[in-house]
C-alpha cells in the first residue's frame, strides 16, 4: 500500500491511499479525522 499527501483545491491536506491493485484511491480529509 502506498500513501501520499496532497492538497486539494481548497488547500486542505488530503491523504491519497492506493488500494492493492493501485488503480483506485481513497481520499481522506485529515482536517476531519484528526
Curated annotation (Swiss-Prot):
Q: According to its UniProt record, where is this protein located?
A: Secreted
- The annotated regions of Basic residues compositional bias extend over 14-23
Q: What's in the keyword line of the UniProt record? A: Secreted
**Superkingdom assignment:** Eukaryota
Q: Where is the composition biased (Basic and acidic residues)?
A: 24-34
Mainly resides where?
A: secreted
User: What is the reported tissue distribution?
Assistant: Expressed by the venom gland.
Q: Which GO terms describe its cellular component?
A: extracellular region
The UniProt record lists the keyword DNA repair: no
Q: Tell whether Zinc is among the UniProt keywords.
A: no
Q: Where is this region: Disordered?
A: 1-34
Q: Which family does it belong to?
A: Belongs to the non-disulfide-bridged peptide (NDBP) superfamily.
* Name of protein: Non-cysteinic peptide Bs 10
Q: Which organism is it from?
A: Hottentotta tamulus sindicus (Scorpion)
Amino acid at each position: 500500500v502506498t500513501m501520499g499527501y496532497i492538497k486539494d483545491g481548497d488547500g486542505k491536506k488530503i491523504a491519497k491511499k492506493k488500494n492493492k491493485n493501485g488503480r483506485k484511491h481513497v481520499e481522506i480529509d485529515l482536517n476531519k479525522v484528526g
